[in-house]
Swiss-Prot record:
Region annotation D1: where it falls in the sequence: 272-307
Protein name: Minor capsid protein VP2
Listed GO biological process terms: monoatomic ion transmembrane transport; symbiont entry into host cell via permeabilization of host membrane; viral penetration into host nucleus; virion attachment to host cell
Ranges annotated as biased composition (Basic residues): 341-351
Highest taxon of source: Viruses
Lipidation residue positions, type N-myristoyl glycine: 2
Keyword ATP-binding: no
Protein family per UniProt: Belongs to the polyomaviruses capsid protein VP2 family.
């Protein structure tokens, strides 16, 4: 590479001397324009004056053979020097890569450009609190030094406070305002819906539940005993039995007592289309009132459902009865003994 730089210095000096002697610029000599112009002049001298010798024509123009040789050979020399520089630089880069490769041949993962390129698959994991983990409190100290200049702590403190205030005005206040507006809108909607449910007139509609009431009545009227038992009692007593009644055979002497229905108390039924009467708060305080069946709904809209209301609405929690191990083992023992007795009886009957 040093020899190439030396040749470049000699070439630049020769081209500069030729440019000073002929009046052409270095760019024209390097591009070959000066050599083309001189050849045109030599051709014109050979045509007009009949000079056929190149040396005589060069002398007639006022150039020396050395200067003409430099001007004519400068473009080719520059092109060859460029190729030489490219070759030398390519060899040097290959040598550098080979040196790095063979010096780090034991590494299985290439680390070339790992720390310069952010899009690599492998990167060093350095979280923001990395140095604060190693040295607790260093981030706070660095931030204070960065934000407050000890030499000009007054202006820097004012600038820091103004920036923090501007950050709050620009970013925090709009978000807080939108959240508060959302809360107030939701609260207003719930309050309006609750007051609408309180002030509206409610009407009883039994049509959707008549079908379920009929099914409930049907299953409640079914006999709690098997029809075969009823037939046996009827055959014994000589009485005809109609199914679809509620029977009770506890301490029964005849089929009439078995087929006797239970007397149900007549309850006042509420008919469809009747309006629910509104009640006014006593004492003249004009407090808000609501029926008891609507209270869980209204409190749920306001988000104040108490455990007592949850138990009233969902019913008490029924816990499973635990069975002791002793009783279960006794039950298993009795079942096993019953099975063995049955087996013995069957064997004796076969024999």
């Amino acid at each position: 590479m040093g020899a190439a730089l030396a040749l470049l210095g000699d070439l630049v000096a020769s081209v500069s001397e030729a440019a000073a002697a002929t009046g052409f610029s270095v760019a024209e000599i390097a591009a070959g324009e000066a050599a083309a112009a001189i050849e045109v002049q030599i051709a014109s001298l050979a045509t007009v004056e009949g000079i056929t010798s190149t040396s005589e024509a060069i002398a007639a123009i006022g150039l020396t053979p050395q200067t003409y040789a430099v001007i004519a050979g400068a473009p080719g020399a520059i092109a060859g020097f460029a190729a030489l520089i490219q070759t030398v630089s390519g060899i040097s880069s290959l040598a550098q890569v080979g040196y790095r490769f063979f010096s780090d041949w034991d590494h299985k993962v290439s680390t070339v450009g790992l720390y310069q390129q952010s899009g690599m698959a492998l990167e060093l994991f350095n979280p923001d609190e990395y140095y604060d983990i190693l040295f607790p409190g260093v981030n706070t100290f660095v931030n204070n030094i960065q934000y407050l200049d000890p030499r000009h702590w007054g202006p820097s403190l004012f600038a820091t406070i103004s920036q923090a205030l501007w950050h709050v005005i620009r970013d925090d206040i709009p978000s807080i305002t939108s959240q508060e507006l959302q809360r107030r809108t939701e609260r207003f909607f719930r309050d309006s819906l609750a007051r609408f449910l309180e002030e509206t007139t409610w009407t009883i509609v039994n049509a959707p539940i008549n079908f379920y009431n009929y099914i409930q009545q049907y299953y409640s009227d079914l006999s709690p005993i098997r029809p075969s038992m009823v037939r046996q009692v009827a055959e014994r007593e000589g009485t005809r039995v109609h199914f679809g009644h509620t029977y009770s055979i506890d301490d029964a002497d005849s089929i009439e007592e078995v087929t006797q229905r239970m007397d149900l108390r007549n309850q006042q039924s509420v008919h469809s289309g009747e309006f629910i009467e509104k009640t006014i708060a006593p004492g003249g305080a004009n407090q808000r009132t609501a029926p008891q069946w609507m209270l869980p709904l209204l409190l749920g809209l306001y988000g104040t459902v108490t455990p007592a209301l949850e138990a009233y609405e969902d019913g008490p929690n029924q816990k499973k009865r635990r069975v002791s191990r002793g009783s279960s083992q006794k039950a298993k023992g009795t079942r096993a003994s019953a099975k063995t007795t049955n087996k013995r009886r069957s064997r004796s009957s076969r024999s």
